[in-house]
Amino acid sequence: MSRSSPRALPPGALPRPLPAAPAAVQRALLPPWPRRAGRRWPASPLGMKVFRRKALVLCAGYALLLVLTMLNLLDYKWHKEPLQQCNPDGPLGAAVGAAGAGWGRPGSPPAAPPRAHSRMDPRTPYRPPAAGVGAVPAAAAGSAGAAASLGNATRGTRGGGDKRQLVYVFTTWRSGSSFFGELFNQNPEVFFLYEPVWHVWQKLYPGDAVSLQGAARDMLSALYRCDLSVFQLYSPAGSGGRNLTTLGIFGAATNKVVCSSPLCPAYRKEVVGLVDDRVCKKCPPQRLARFEEECRKYRTLVIKGVRVFDVAVLAPLLKDPALDLKVIHLVRDPRAVASSRIRSRHGLIRESLQVVRSRDPRAHRMPFLEAAGHKLGAKKEGMGGPADYHALGAMEVICNSMAKTLQTALQPPDWLQGHYLVVRYEDLVGDPVKTLRRVYDFVGLLVSPEMEQFALNMTSGSGSSSKPFVVSARNATQAANAWRTALTFQQIKQVEEFCYQPMAVLGYERVNSPEEVKDLSKTLLRKPRL
């Protein structure tokens, strides 16, 4: 047998395996990895292994993100959409209440009288207990016990009705609304909130002013029911959301309820006087649930806002039979508003941009304002720059919205009759006590000597207005007429062009010459039509 021929194997025997080739030979024998245009592929099995690991990690990350998203949605639905509450006024609610508390059952023990400040579901509107249903007669409880059970709910109010009185101070920026709001913030019988819709505008920025009106109304609807958890929906990113406290609410550092006992020992609610925000910021933060409990103790709830542009936006709230809402429309000479906006233009630049975005692009504009806004080389800090342009441009939207509101008020629908009051800032600073009494009578509050003295002190001080966002005692005459020396005649005519309709209704006379503007002995106030 030749040496080159293979040796025959016995029957049933397996051939002996050949020795393994070196790794370099194996790689050389492998076919080249397929390549596609525009796509890189691993050049070796080791690269393929790394590629597969990266793909697995990426898929696992996407799966984890999907799971976390679903858990977040379930957590939101669990906390923000509780079980449907049974309507106590409906047939089913009455039946459940009778079965649970024994009302109306023969031989059952009488129900205990409700506590004056018991915690209730924040989404349930304030409803006083009906006479004869689960309530102990006053004769049985005694007059002293009945008065003690009411507590602060009826103190200092006119009439003593059972329904909670709700008030919305409807105004715009730089109209003296901070001072006007203090007339309610300082009242011991009032729960006051300072511009809560600010949270909506900040969260939904850069939405224009008109598109945010519905969200603003929804927030007010919740707040008037003492559902303060609505602040969590619009809390800033990274602020904790569900862990938001009282000090995270806009304007809380000067709120008398937040800074007074029992929430904070720094002040006493019954003592009239401005709150120092530096002191209030040191108060311990309180949970919103605790703030809600304080809200339900007050029979009068007042919200001041500048971000609702038309009273018709509030129509659903005014029509709601569960809410006894009244609107106080605080107005000011639009020329004074424009002057104050220019002076504080950099502090309001964000809001001015949101308002300017709501302008009608078909509206006529006077050429000098457009030139001022796009002036080449204009400095941000100088007059005639972009900040001035937005400050004056916002007046167009503000005055158009004011004209719609005043037109509605001149021919009020049923939902507005008896629920609307116009207050001019010039009348407030000219005769603060008379205006205070008129406002308090409208909302059913009693005027105390301390509040009268507070109003007088705030309008007869000598403080400077160099800080436009700080409430302080100032000279009323200087504050009302400052625009006549601060604005140019062209700026005055621009504002009058935008605002001639509301000016005519509210009794603000237009000027014809620069000399007439500078003549401070001549009043430009006339009797308003409202």
UniProtKB/Swiss-Prot annotation:
Keyword rRNA processing: no
Lineage: Eukaryota, Metazoa, Chordata, Craniata, Vertebrata
EC code: 2.8.2.-
Gene designation: Chst2
PANTHER family: CARBOHYDRATE SULFOTRANSFERASE, CARBOHYDRATE SULFOTRANSFERASE 2
Record topology, Cytoplasmic segments: 1-54
Span list, region Disordered: 1-20, 97-128
The protein's name in its UniProt record: Carbohydrate sulfotransferase 2
Membrane topology: Single-pass type II membrane protein
GO-annotated molecular function: N-acetylglucosamine 6-O-sulfotransferase activity; sulfotransferase activity
GO aspect biological process, one term: positive regulation of leukocyte tethering or rolling
Alphabetized InterPro entries for the sequence: Carbohydrate_sulfotransferase, Gal/GlcNAc/GalNAc_ST, P-loop_NTPase, Sulfotransferase_dom
Source organism of the structure: Mus musculus
Effect of a null allele: Mice are impaired in the elaboration of sialyl 6-sulfo Lewis X in HEV. Lymphocyte homing to peripheral lymph nodes, mesenteric lymph nodes, and Peyer patches are significantly reduced. Simultaneous knockdown of CHST4 and CHST2 results in lower contact hypersensitivity response when compared to wild-type littermates.
SUPFAM superfamilies membership: P-loop containing nucleoside triphosphate hydrolases (SSF52540)
Record carries keyword Glycoprotein: yes
Subcellular location: Golgi apparatus, trans-Golgi network membrane
Top EC group: transferase
Associated pathway: Protein modification; carbohydrate sulfation
Quaternary structure and interacting proteins, as annotated: Homodimer; disulfide-linked. Homodimerization is not essential for enzyme activity.
Protein family per UniProt: Belongs to the sulfotransferase 1 family. Gal/GlcNAc/GalNAc subfamily.
Parts of the chain that traverse the membrane: 55-75
Classification via Pfam families: Sulfotransfer_1
